[in-house]
Every structure is written in structure tokens, then in C-alpha cells.
Amino acid sequence: MRAFRLASGVLRNRKVILGIGAGSLITAGNIKIRNDSKFDAFFAKGFPDELQHRSLFSVLRSAFVYEICSRAWLVKLSLGAMSLCDVFHLSFLYNPFCRYTFYKHFCGGETPQAVMATMDTLQAAGITSCLNYSREVDLDGDMDVNKIASQGVVPPQVPVPSEKNQKVLRQIADKAFESNMHIIDMATYKPGTVCAVKLTPFINPLVLQRYNSILNQYPVESACNYLEHLKSPELSTYEVSELKKFWEYADKLCQFAKEKQIPLFIDAEQTYFQDCMHAVTVDLMRKYNKEVAIVHNTYQLYLKKSRKIMDDHIKKCVAEGWLMGAKLVRGAYLNSEPRFLIHDTKAETDKDFDSAVEAIIAAAAKFAPGDPASASDPIASRKGKWGIMVASHNKKTMFESVNLAETKKVDFTKTSFYLAQLLGMADDITYALAYSQRNQQPNFCIVKYVSCGPISEVLPYLVRRARENIDALDRCKEERAYYRQALRRRIF
């Protein structure tokens, strides 16, 4: 297997966190972790035991990371410092620091060997890996879709880029395709491993945005036909060519995943891409989810229309005879989306999310063909089953998901059920879930999203995660408390 190519850490218009000394790790005030109820007792188990088996250096590093992440002012200051370094092309000042702190904590490794070691560690704790090549691409000038989207302008037709820009786009697409193929191949190292893939590097983003605007004109019921709508007279010859190449890249990835029997979870995108992502993913599910759920779509329930879209896709899979694959999340682009598209309150988002989880579980129990022979070992077989992933760092969501499993509302002969968090985040949740299945036959998979690749390519991903979580200070403080207590136990 070919190793990832290491690259230099130049980062433009994207910043990651710089920090301060770790002197406050042990001496700061003690934040108690409550365990005075069934709910709190559930999450008090697992992670404290896990920390006891980690090296002192590993605990110190993680504690240092969370000391920074739990202070919004420090995160913002660090982002500013990174921006200043980038202006003067001084990224080498922060790259080594980031490699041995944030990258080590949040990412699986730069080489296949390092990623496999991470997979081994997780598997030993009863946790499945979801491998993810986490490169995020920024394009300059006329191809900067963020700039175009912020202006609210979609051109009547996307002009054919210069030969130079077309070459850049092809290089980006080919590199992303090659890296995702390696990730899928690497997933075969551990049985049960799954992959997450980001499809947007495969196409000129302006073409994707324009096709998204065309699909958005159709009712939900007819919008999710990616190949059918390529016949639209609104599309130019160049746009159709780009959209067909986009399909070819995605199709080849899914074909390879099917050959390797690796489930793929297609990443969600900003709303100016998302209708197109729904359409292409549904067409891929139609093709590849006949016997086993290989392709999984992502539904962001903080968007008002996502529940209706998910319900429509369920109806289609039942009517057309393919298996549903779904990942349910609240959402990842809250700070960059048009506000009117998002639920007015978090309570409304939570209500939509919880009802969507219950609805798709009930639909799987009713409509999925299933595999009755898998009753004694549900994880061993995915034949005839819907794939459902609940991805959240919300303790209440995870607790209720476990209750659904324990009260038999999840039919494990008809559902491959995944509960997922990001590597390095919400470890108290992940290890509590793993603890709940210790010493028994597991019915569902506990998953960590393992981002991997050269640090220079993964750094923008870390930056986006930092920005997304600036407002989630309570969660960071709660995780910080575990590391403080672990250090106190070892040192005092």
C-alpha cells in the first residue's frame, strides 16, 4: 500500500489554533463530573478507565489541547496569529507545534502505518473506525465559490475556465480520488471499518453550485435524480461535461467500495451544494444498495427541509427496492448558512433530529428485508439491512439512542446501527458507549471518525472544526474536566 505523501504546511486563508503554556492544567478549579443519576452514571463509566491506560504525555497533550479549546478568546486570538503568519508566508512557525498537539489529538496519522495503529487502538476498546481523507480545498479568484455564494450570485452559465485553471481542477480531483481509493483500501485492514468521503473536490465548484440551483427549482420529490436532470436545457456543454466527470469519479469510488464491501458515508455540504449532493447520492444508492447498504446519504437536521427530504428518500427506497443508507447529524455549517434555512431555535432542531432518528429506525423495522440469520451476531452481516448512523456529540441523543437499542425498537436483523463521534472529541461519550457493550455480544457499532492525511492538507479541516466549536464551550469544559482529574490522580 502506498504511503501518504508528506507535504509542506502552507495554509492560505485558513488558520488553526496556537496556544499557551500548560501551567493551568492541574491548578485550575475543579469541575466535578456528576454521577448522581442513571444518565450521568452511564457517562461516568468508560472514559476514566481509558485515561488510566494512556501515557502521561498523551494525557498532558490532550489536556493542553482542551485548555485552549475551552477558551473562546484564546481560540480567536490563535486564529488571528495564524492568519498573520500566513500573510508573511511563515507557516513553518506553527506547523511543528500543530503536528505534535492538535494533529496528534484529532487526527489518525499521516501514513497508512500510523492510521492502522490508531485503528488497532480503537478496536481494542471496542470502537470501529470511520476513515476520512480530510483535505479541504480553497480556490482563488473567479473559482472561489465562497465569494460567489456570499454575493448571492449564480451565473446564467459557468464560463469555461482557462487551461491553467482546468489543469488545477483536474489535479485536485485526481489527487482526491486517489487518496479516497487508498482510504477505502486501508479500511479492509480491520473488519467492520467504514469510510466517509467528500465528493466536492471532483468538480468545478461553480458548476456544482449552478446545478444545485437548477435542482432547487424542482419539488423535493423529483429533485433527487442527478443523471436525469443532466438533460436540462439550462446546462451548457461544458457544465454537462463537468457533471458527468463528477459522476464518474463518485461512481468509481462506490464501485471500489462495493468490491471491498466497505460502507461509504457521503459528507454533507453547504446548502449551495447540498441539493446536488442529495441527488447524486440517491442515484448512487439506487445503483449500489441492492443487497447491502454501501452508500449512505447525510441529513443535516438543523435545516428546515431536511426531514422532508429524508422522508421522501425513504419512500423512494421502499418503492424502488433498494436499501436506505443514512447518517443523521444536526449540522456542521451553522455559521456559514443563510439563517432563514435553519430552524429558529435549537429546541426545534433537537425535536426534528430526535423524531428523524425514531422515524428511520421504525421504517427500517417495517420495510427493510433484513437478515434473520444475523440475530445472534448482528454486526457480522449487513445483508438486506438499512444502514443508519446517528452522529452526535450530544449526550442526551446518544443516551436515547442506546435506549432505543435496549428496548428493542431497533431491529438489528434489519438495521446496521452506528453511533458516531469525531476522533479526539466527545471521548467520554464514545468510551461510555463502548463500556455499555463490554463483555457481551455487541448489537451496534460505536464509531470514531478518523481523519488522516498529511498535516498540510488536514490543517484546514482542523481549523473548520475549531471555528465550528467556538460556541460549544460547555462541551469543551466538560471534556477538559476529565483530563484535569486524570492528571490529579497521577500527580497528587
UniProtKB/Swiss-Prot annotation:
Its main location: mitochondrion. It comes from the Eukaryota. This is Probable proline dehydrogenase, mitochondrial. GO terms for biological process: proline catabolic process to glutamate. Its cofactor is FAD. It comes from Schizosaccharomyces pombe (strain 972 / ATCC 24843) (Fission yeast). InterPro entries: FAD-linked_oxidoreductase-like, Proline_DH_dom, Proline_oxidase. Coiled coil: none annotated. Its EC number is 1.5.5.2. SUPFAM superfamilies: FAD-linked oxidoreductase. GO terms for cellular component: mitochondrial matrix; mitochondrion. Belongs to the proline oxidase family.
